[in-house]
């Protein structure tokens, strides 16, 4: 039980007078609304009352326990309960959280998605970066597919980020089952029209999308001046799709596998998602979601496209610096 406040000078003076008048302890307690124990302690030694220091409150965790808590939380997805049980501590979950917060080096952070990379993937990414340092990125059409859900973007994943360490990542498969799939593309100066596609799109479907939008766009430019960027999804690199590119004389950018962090359209998708789901908006029907996507796509200003494309050189530098490992873009 917490201790009450010390008697004030006025209360002490009242007690001194009441003691001279032989007022009972019970009556003193009633008159000044203080406990009999408090009054008794004062009357026992009025001179030294209030001069002794209270013993400091015992800490729930020792210094060693706190170090173990920080070590257990470091770059992990453990909850405060998990950490408490793992270390067999009697402290509350709030105490565990306070220790982590006071550490100054661990914060709650969302897991950053990144592909699983083999040594060969990293080597190909590194080679791509070195070979394309002089590429004119304003002449590249960047493309990708994106999934949207009626009830908002995919769930967030958070963990205890140790600021002294590299951020953790999580890996996920493409096309895990959504409600609306779109194909999009853009250049430094222009967004191509969004195309709604099937999540089970095959090579022929993909070629139809390219014919409908990419070929229409390239008709206004010299094809030899432009290169088309796509990832290495099966329908993108199938024999029939390769034949289509040859027939249409569309030059391809030799893109390294598992490299969404290199593609600025991933950042454009992020901008689009924030607009589509602004203020935690959800959509009752597929039709309303599609309209929301179209409206959001049109609202993105062209000056943002230029800054995204111009980030390519910085991305390549980061790939070289990290020797092909995932980069934070």
Swiss-Prot record:
Record has Nucleus as a keyword:
yes
Please tell me whether the keyword DNA-binding is annotated for this protein. Answer: yes
Per the database entry, where does the chain bind DNA?
Answer: 2-135
* Subcellular location(s) of the protein: Nucleus
The UniProt keyword set, sorted, is: DNA integration, DNA recombination, DNA-binding, Nucleus, Transposable element
- Which GO CC annotations does the UniProt entry carry? nucleus
What does the record list as GO biological process? Answer: DNA integration; DNA recombination
Annotated InterPro entries: Homeodomain-like_sf, RNaseH_sf, Tc1-like_DDE_dom, Tc3_transposase_DNA-bd_dom, Tnp_Tc3-like_HTH, Transposase_5, WH-like_DNA-bd_sf
- A GO molecular function held by the record: DNA binding
Q: What is its main location?
A: nucleus
Q: Which family does it belong to?
A: Belongs to the transposase 5 family.
**Quaternary data:** Homodimer or homotetramer.
Described by its record, this protein's role is as follows: Binds specifically to the terminal nucleotides of the TC3 inverted repeat. Its expression results in frequent excision and transposition of endogenous TC3 elements. TC3 transposase acts by making double strand breaks at the ends of TC3 element. The excised element would then be inserted into a target sequence.
Q: State the name under which the record lists this protein.
A: Transposable element Tc3 transposase
Q: What is the lineage of its organism?
A: Eukaryota, Metazoa, Ecdysozoa, Nematoda, Chromadorea
| Gene name per UniProt | tc3a
């Amino acid at each position: 039980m917490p201790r009450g406040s010390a008697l004030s000078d006025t209360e002490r003076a009242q007690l001194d007078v009441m003691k001279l008048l032989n007022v009972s302890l019970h009556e003193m307690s009633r008159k000044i609304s203080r406990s009999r124990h408090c009054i008794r302690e004062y009357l026992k030694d009025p001179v030294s009352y209030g001069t002794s220091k209270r013993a400091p409150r015992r800490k729930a965790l020792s210094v060693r326990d706190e170090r173990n808590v920080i070590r257990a939380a470091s770059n992990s997805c453990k909850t405060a309960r998990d950490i408490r049980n793992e270390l067999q501590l009697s402290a509350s979950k709030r105490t565990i959280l306070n220790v982590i917060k006071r550490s100054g080096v661990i914060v709650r952070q969302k897991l950053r998605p990144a592909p699983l990379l083999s040594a060969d993937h990293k080597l190909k990414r590194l080679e791509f970066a070195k070979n394309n340092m002089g590429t004119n990125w304003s002449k590249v059409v960047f493309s990708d597919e994106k999934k949207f859900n009626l009830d908002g973007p995919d769930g967030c994943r958070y963990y205890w980020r140790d600021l002294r360490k590299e951020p953790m990542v999580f890996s996920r498969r493409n096309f895990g089952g959504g409600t609306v799939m779109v194909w999009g593309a853009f250049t430094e100066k222009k967004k191509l029209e969004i195309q709604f596609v099937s999540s089970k799109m095959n090579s022929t479907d993909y070629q139809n999308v390219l014919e409908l939008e990419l070929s229409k766009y390239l008709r206004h430019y010299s094809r030899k001046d432009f290169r088309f960027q796509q990832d290495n999804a099966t329908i993108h690199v199938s024999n029939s799709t390769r034949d289509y590119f040859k027939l249409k004389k569309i030059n391809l950018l030799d893109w390294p596998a598992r490299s969404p962090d290199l593609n600025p359209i991933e950042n454009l998708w992020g901008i689009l998602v924030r607009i589509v789901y602004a203020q935690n908006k959800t959509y009752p029907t597929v039709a309303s979601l599609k309209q929301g996507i179209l409206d959001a796509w049109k609202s993105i200003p062209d000056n943002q496209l230029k800054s995204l494309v111009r980030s390519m050189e910085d991305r390549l530098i980061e790939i070289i610096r990290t020797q092909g490992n995932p980069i934070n873009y």
